[in-house]
């Protein structure tokens, strides 16, 4: 191998090493920012790392919403048809938030309660987020409840 070929090989190997390192760093950064969607059943079953940030999806239980007068602190429960999980948030809730509607909340589990730093609500009476619809459909099939296909946008 000539000196020119050796130098070229060294540069190619260095470029491959640098691109591999860059790919690994990007993958690690993205992994830390991913928030997976779980249902209350999965959370209560222990499928979630208690220290991790994740999204909780389901329906707001009717009669569970509570907000003290003059406070932003809101408490409600989310269900997937199998289990219910208490949720608290001190953020402003979206206008479309209501009991009996689908929500996706982002946050962390703390002492058995999901502390949400963001709550997203459905857009209209036919819309349910696809991930929530899929997981709710699984719960309905498990309990032999007829599954109505919501419109997914």
UniProtKB/Swiss-Prot annotation:
GO term, biological process aspect, one: cytochrome complex assembly
Compartments, as annotated in UniProt: Cell membrane
Similarity section: Belongs to the CcmE/CycJ family.
Membrane-crossing segments per the record: 9-29
Topology versus the membrane: Single-pass type II membrane protein
Binding, heme: 123, 127
Pfam entry (one): CcmE
An example molecular function term from Gene Ontology annotations: metal ion binding
Gene name in the database record: ccmE
Protein name according to UniProt: Cytochrome c-type biogenesis protein CcmE
NCBIfam families associated with the record: PRK13254.1-1 (NF009727), PRK13254.1-2 (NF009728)
């Amino acid at each position: 191998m000539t000196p020119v070929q050796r130098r070229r090989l060294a540069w190619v190997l260095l470029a491959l090493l640098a691109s591999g390192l860059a790919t690994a760093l990007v993958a690690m950064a993205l992994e830390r920012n991913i928030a997976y969607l779980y249902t209350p059943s999965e959370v209560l079953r222990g499928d979630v790392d208690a220290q991790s940030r994740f999204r909780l999806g389901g329906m707001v239980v009717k009669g569970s919403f509570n907000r003290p007068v003059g406070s932003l602190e809101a408490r409600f429960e989310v269900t997937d048809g199998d289990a219910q999980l208490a949720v608290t948030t001190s953020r402003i809730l979206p206008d479309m938030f209501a009991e009996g509607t689908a929500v996706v909340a982002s946050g962390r589990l703390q002492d058995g309660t999901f502390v949400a730093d963001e709550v997203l609500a459905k857009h209209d009476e036919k819309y349910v987020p696809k991930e929530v619809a899929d997981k709710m459909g699984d719960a309905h099939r498990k309990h032999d409840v007829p599954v109505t296909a919501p419109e997914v946008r």
